[in-house]
C-alpha cells in the first residue's frame, strides 16, 4: 500500500511545482500548544505541501541554535509529546503533517502506543534523525500496517551504496541534508552539492527534498532545480517567534507556488 504522504507529494511533483515543507516547533507560540493550529492554518493558507512539526527535546543533536531555543521555549511551557499528540487528535489538517522527533521521547511514550495514537491524527510522516537505518526495525514493524511513512535522511557524506540502501523501499520522501552539521547553517554548501542532489533525485522513485540551511528565495530556486523541493526550518521558526507572520506567509507562498 502506497502511503498517503508519498502519493500527495508525488502529485505535486507531477504537476511541475516545487514541494515546500515548512518546519515549526510544537508549543513555541505565545499561547503554547493552544496556538499550534493557528500556525498550521497560516501555513496551509499559504499553500504548503506538508508541515513538519518538531517535538521539543532536551538534547536535540541535529538542531541548530534557533530551533534548539524554540524547543527550550516550548519545554518551559511544559509541552510534552503526549500533550502534542492529544492536541493533534483534536482536529484534522488540510495537508499532511510530518513529525520530527528524537528516539528517546518515542521510547518513553511506548512505540506501539505512539504509532497507534499518531494514526488518530493528520500525521502521515515521521523523521527520527538519531535512529540509524540499521536500527529502524525498532519502529518499522509498527508502521508497516499504518499510513505513516518513516522518512530517511541522506547526507552528503553518505556513500553511494549506503544511499541506495536508504532510498530503496523508502516511503514519503527522501530528506536530503544539504550541509554537514546542524540545522540553520547557511552558505557553507559543498561544491559538489548540486551534482549530489541531482544524482539522488534521478535515482529515487519518490520525491527528494533538500533541507538544512535553506533560508532564502534564491535557495528555493537553486534546490528546486536539482531536487523536488525544499524543507525550511530555522528561518520560519525565527520569523514566527519574532511576530513576522506576514513575512512568513509571503515567503511560504513563494516557495509553495514555485513553478518548475
From Swiss-Prot:
The keyword Amino-acid biosynthesis applies. GO terms for molecular function: tryptophan synthase activity. Gene3D superfamilies: Aldolase class I (3.20.20.70). InterPro entries: Aldolase_TIM (IPR013785), RibuloseP-bd_barrel (IPR011060), Trp_synthase_alpha_AS (IPR018204), Trp_synthase_suA (IPR002028). The keyword 4Fe-4S does not apply. Pathway: Amino-acid biosynthesis; L-tryptophan biosynthesis; L-tryptophan from chorismate: step 5/5. SUPFAM superfamilies: Ribulose-phoshate binding barrel. Keywords: Amino-acid biosynthesis, Aromatic amino acid biosynthesis, Lyase, Tryptophan biosynthesis. The alpha subunit is responsible for the aldol cleavage of indoleglycerol phosphate to indole and glyceraldehyde 3-phosphate. This is Tryptophan synthase alpha chain.
